[in-house]
Amino acid sequence: MKRVLTTTMAVALGAALSSPAFATNGYFTHGVGTASKAMAGTGIGSNADMGAIMAASNPALAVFTGDQWEVGLAVFSPMRSYKASTSQLNGGLIPIDPANNVFLPSLTITPGGVDSSSELFPIPYVAKSWSLQNKAKLSFAFYGRGGMNTDWDSSNASATSYFCGGDPLVGDPPATGPGPFCAGDAGVDLSQAFLAVNYSAKIGDNFAWGAGPIFAVQLFKAKGIGTFAPITESFAASGGTALPTSLTNNSHDSSTGFGFGAGLWWGITDTVSAGLAYQSTISMNEFGDYADLFAEQGDFDIPSSLKGGLSFLASDALRVNLDVEYTAYSDVDSVGNPMANMLTCPTLPFGGTSLSNCLGGDNGAGFGWDDMTTYKLGFEWQRDENNTWRFGYSYGKQPIQAADVLFNILAPGVMEQHITFGLTRQTTNGGAWSFSFMYAPEKTVTGPNMFDTTQTIELKMKQLEFEVGYSF
């Protein structure tokens, strides 16, 4: 058993960290586990057996599972693009104080639409639960839930700016360079994997609790954003003499950290139950190779989340789940700080004096994401003793502000709606196959280019996902 566990974990870890994806509620998936995903991520308050992986969503729910293994694999397809409008500046100078010859180079993205490549990603999970004395359970769940990936090919994307080349003092026009930031192929690659180990127990027949530590590991790489080198803290601190070495085009960097999760379940009546689950902020080591990009010298913690749910047995065959999930993206500075913070970096001509507002500084720019609240509705219909059908819908206002669309070309987390369905079929040997499908309708966010306010940028994405799981 120890060898099986070690081998399974190693395979899952390698798959999770080699499979970046841009997830669906911000940069988190719409749920964890095949059965829950088929109901739009609901089930926090349900005592139905949805597999050992449900302990990752609410640790208390492990008491309702058998002693079982569960493995699953999703194939996730995010189809993302951006579209830039025409510009009146076309990379020219923005007058700040013309009387004193103070100008800011604009950055104009070449008008037109560009699609990101890399549209298929595998996302695995594995979970196990064991019975202990006094109706208690020990469980572990290893899963990928967070991540983002964009890949903008320089062969069909470009930008024009004096940041790219040319000297206005001698009458040169601004240069046009490849990539959306005129620094070659651009994009980010973030993978996050989680290991949750939980102890859960019942108190009487109508109450259960669970808690345990969460270990996380993440990998990150960025490319094609060297245009922002003059706005980094290290460049400003050097007096403009030393370009940053931890901003872009380095290899994948890794980061690890710990947090905790806890959950409750309450059987209110024979047909109504409720659940509550909390995951703390997971404090991660800094990405040293990207200390000039992320606020607080490369810090990229994983935000906390709070989930609550009600579950109703409408009949012997039909269960209805109502869930809500709150994710505190703004608590993580590298995610929540607005892009406008960089405008007060001393290297830009706006009179800023604080190095901490430059990229990589303690108050450096992030992606400007708001916190996100997602409302979910799920249905579980047991057609017969061997087949259970599931359906779901969720809505959450996307976290990106219009003013921050330029940076969010790298991380266009704009999805709001998810439509899901799935099936669990029992097998003759005591196992069960589960399937889920998710469709996220196309959503766009449009806002001004912060370095060329005569231009607008439209971020667009839609998504598909198919997942299969097996418990035994």
In which residue ranges do the predicted regions lie?
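N-terminal, post-signal peptide beta-strand-biased segments of exported outer-membrane/organellar beta-barrel
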Residues: 19-144, 410-415
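Outer-membrane beta-barrel porins/channels
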Residues: 22-36, 121-472
